[in-house]
């Protein structure tokens, strides 16, 4: 991901029809998260990144090893799905790029980007309540169903990532 702020923002991102950018644009932080070209990878901080919503055709990687588990990812513009040891972990419709995906006993965190708003489903603990945050703002409590799936909608725009945090109550 590339991050700029203030006067560091390249001219290509700030000029509007030959005019100087507004102060608001100059002060705004701009983040650009790229898709995961290799479809899945382990980050230096030990988290997973996966998904490429820019692909026209479905692509997949199987048997990707991470911390002793085998992952399978399928991704393209219509869907991104990842499984761990044959079990469901994450799915988005339409497809997304996910960065820094991490799971603990009580929390799931990740950054997500896509072309448009996405319906995201994650596997959690069965029949439990969770608090969901998007970019640090609480969007409400949600309860998983009997199979442990939690679904949420995330407003996405290409070039802007949203930080999602799901915490068990």
Where are these regions (language model features)?
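Extreme N-terminal basic, low-complexity initiation segments
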Residues: 2-6, 11
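Catalytic cores of secreted or luminal carbohydrate-active enzymes
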Residues: 12-14, 18-97
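C-terminal beta-strand-rich structural cap/linker in extracellular carbohydrate-active enzymes
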Residues: 59-84, 92, 118-120, 144-169
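Beta-strand-rich interaction surfaces with strong enrichment in secreted/lumenal proteins
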Residues: 97-100, 107-110, 141-142, 151-155
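Non-catalytic accessory regions flanking glycosidase/transglycosidase catalytic cores in CAZymes
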Residues: 104-106, 119
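Surface-exposed beta-strand/loop patches in extracellular or lumenal glycoproteins
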Residues: 111-128
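Surface-exposed interfaces of beta-sheet-rich extracellular modules
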Residues: 129-133
């Amino acid at each position: 991901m590339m991050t700029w702020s203030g006067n560091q923002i390249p001219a290509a991102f700030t000029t509007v029809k030959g005019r100087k950018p507004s102060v608001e644009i100059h002060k705004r932080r701009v983040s650009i998260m790229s898709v995961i070209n290799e479809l899945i990878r382990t980050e230096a901080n030990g988290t997973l990144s996966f998904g490429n919503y820019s692909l026209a055709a479905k692509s997949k990687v199987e048997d990707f090893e991470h911390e002793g588990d085998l992952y399978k990812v399928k991704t393209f513009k219509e869907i991104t799905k990842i499984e761990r040891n044959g079990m469901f972990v994450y799915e988005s419709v339409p497809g997304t790029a996910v960065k820094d995906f991490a799971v603990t006993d009580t929390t799931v965190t990740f950054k997500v980007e896509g072309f448009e708003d996405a319906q995201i489903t994650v596997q959690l603990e069965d029949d439990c309540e969770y608090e969901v945050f998007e970019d640090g703002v609480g969007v409400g409590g949600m309860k998983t169903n009997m199979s442990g799936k939690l679904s949420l909608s995330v407003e996405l725009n290409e070039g802007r990532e949203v930080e999602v945090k799901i915490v068990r109550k």
